[in-house]
Amino acid sequence: MASLAPLSVAAEVALAAVGATALLVSGAIAVYAFGSFLLMGRHVGARERSRSLRELARELWIAGVTQPLLPLFYFLGRRMDAFFVQRGKEGLAARSAAPRTPIVFVHGYMQNRVGFLGLARALARTGLGPMFGFNYPWFSSIASNARRLERFVAAVCKETGSATVDLVCHSMGGLIAVEMMSDEARRESLKVRRCVTIASPHAGVMWQGPLLGFGAGSLRRGSKLLEAHAGHKLTVPCLSVYSTHDNIVHPKESASLALRGGRDVEVDGLAHLSILFSPKVAEHVAEFLREPDPV
């Protein structure tokens, strides 16, 4: 049997780089999941060990699938529904019967639009859309990213011919959306019909360790930005979806918008990334976006 040709030096270096990257990503995912679940246990109610282990495994699985795709989705995914175009009469009927308000997804800290793949797929099945994924430099300040979001929303409205968009935000993305909607100078020209925040720390996170980026300090409890947000009543219909056992945003009350005029929906036991892949969460989001506008 003929022996395999030896690898070139370049191929060996490439394989070594891929292996090292895989180990680094795997290690980072493991540290994130195990560390955050351990911290969560100090601030939320106890539950069965088997349920905790199942949710930990689910969070590891989802992180393991989505995080290696992060670099790719800096280039892909501006039109999120392009991946899930429904074919046939049933799909076309659903889309024609649905409201044509565009949906803009706003990702969270250290993430990009890849995290919305599951939710975009679920919403596309209901005929909602068109859907756009907004990427922003997460290391920049929340205020500057709110200005970027405003420009992106204006571009989507111009592209689609719609007067408004619906925002669907995860984690820090919800704070960026609230910052944009809280600015009195923007209110007259605001192009947002409805806003959904999912696992967003509206009252800040408990974590007191190091955080990267210019906007990181605004994520902490008691930050000036979050205190300013708390003083503003929401002028757009808003829904906050949060988990009883979010490994990043806890206790659950820190995600509430009820006191500001929003609506809260609580789901049981989902972790910070896996909440975006929950059929129940997708159902809540779709129902809210389909509600008739207040008169």
Model features per residue range: what roles?
Residues 1-103, 117:
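Flexible, membrane-associating and regulatory peripheral segments of lipid-active enzymes
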Residues 104-114, 120-124, 128-235, 241, ...:
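Serine-dependent carboxylesterase/thioesterase catalytic core
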Residues 119, 250-257:
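Short alpha-helix in the alpha/beta-hydrolase fold that links the catalytic acid
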Residues 133-137, 265-277:
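Short glycine-rich catalytic loops that host catalytic nucleophiles or stabilize transition states
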Residues 152-156, 284-295:
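C-terminal alpha-helix
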Residues 243-249, 272-273:
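Acidic catalytic loop of the alpha/beta-hydrolase fold
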